[in-house]
Amino acid sequence: MPIHLECMSHTPLHGYFDPAPEVVAEVERVQRVARERVDAFDPELVIVFAPDHYNGFFYDVMPQFCIGVRATAIGDFNSAAGPLPVARDVALALADAALASDIDVAVSYRMQVDHGCAQALDVLTGGIDRYPVVPVFINSVAPPMASCRRARLLGDAIGRAAARMNRRVLLIGSGGMSHEPPVPEIAAADDVVAERLIAGRNPSPESRNARQSRTIAAAKAFAAGDSRLHPLNPAWDRALLELLERGEIAAADGLTNEAITRDAGKSAHEIRTWVAAFGALAASGPYAASIDYYRAIPEWIAGFGAMHAHEQTLSRR
């Protein structure tokens, strides 16, 4: 059965601190066209590769990869909230497939996903509960982190399993590109912040609002040029987009953690979600890909990109 891919940056700042109206309109147009492709494809299963921002995964036990068997969206930054319609048997089968390929993936029967997962589902499918879904968490912010090569191999294992299913499968990669929002690091954290990074589940509304306010303030400073956050790197972003467009997914193995942080910022590690999604698609053979959008958007502290792809045996959608 056919497999279709959509990869897109996400931002929690949309609606809180926006760029010029014409830029917002550009992004929303790209999102609308992507949604139309998904509607036309009419998936029977959605596999979404997504990061987390210390909302669902913490240092009490920080897996590199985790497949949700049951999952709930927490609704941070006014993103969609509520239970996800997880295809449980499929989730467990994908976990078995990953383990059989020597990818040590965890499973969760109480996964909490934040805007990094929920926004992609909402934008691309019209909600978080429209299609059966399997959420796949990829650690992209909490060192030590697995390599891009391991993310690709995770995608490959999941893609080979998905290709054997008699279903139309939509692959989503949510995250990236170059960006470095104000995410704390446990190595330099005081005791209070460290405890939040270790065991910060289900914070009070006041605590969550304070965190969101800090992010908005950081975005305003970044857009004004008054910030120590890592600058956006459009050249790096475009090089990655073009690599994926050419079908050279294995070349992503050469992206080291140190180089990603140095060149694109500490949260650019979210491109692992794209690498995993393209790895899953490439498991079925050569693919045809299109770069749909790219713009560096300082107000969202993000290099904002979008791509779609499908197997070469299918007509281009």
Swiss-Prot record:
Lineage per the UniProt record: Bacteria, Pseudomonadati, Pseudomonadota, Betaproteobacteria, Burkholderiales
UniProt name for this protein: 2,3-dihydroxyphenylpropionate/2,3-dihydroxicinnamic acid 1,2-dioxygenase
Recorded catalytic activity of this chain's protein: 3-(2,3-dihydroxyphenyl)propanoate + O2 = (2Z,4E)-2-hydroxy-6-oxonona-2,4-dienedioate + H(+); (2E)-3-(2,3-dihydroxyphenyl)prop-2-enoate + O2 = (2Z,4E,7E)-2-hydroxy-6-oxonona-2,4,7-trienedioate + H(+)
A biological-process GO annotation: 3-phenylpropionate catabolic process
EC number of this enzyme: 1.13.11.16
Biological role stated in the UniProt entry: Catalyzes the non-heme iron(II)-dependent oxidative cleavage of 2,3-dihydroxyphenylpropionic acid and 2,3-dihydroxicinnamic acid into 2-hydroxy-6-ketononadienedioate and 2-hydroxy-6-ketononatrienedioate, respectively.
Organism of provenance: Paraburkholderia phymatum (strain DSM 17167 / CIP 108236 / LMG 21445 / STM815)
Family: Belongs to the LigB/MhpB extradiol dioxygenase family.
Keyword hit for Chloroplast: no
Enzyme class of the recorded protein, top EC level: oxidoreductase
InterPro entries (UniProt xref): DHPP/DHXA_dioxygenase (IPR023789), Xdiol_dOase_suB (IPR004183)
Top-level taxon: Bacteria
Molecular-function GO terms, alphabetical: 3-carboxyethylcatechol 2,3-dioxygenase activity; ferrous iron binding
Catalytic residue positions: H115 (proton donor), H179 (proton acceptor)
Cofactor: Fe(2+)
CDD domains, sorted: MhpB_like (cd07365)
One matching Pfam family: LigB
Oligomeric form and interacting partners: Homotetramer.
Keywords: Aromatic hydrocarbons catabolism, Dioxygenase, Iron, Oxidoreductase
Keyword Ribosomal protein part of the UniProt annotation: no
Functional pathway: Aromatic compound metabolism; 3-phenylpropanoate degradation
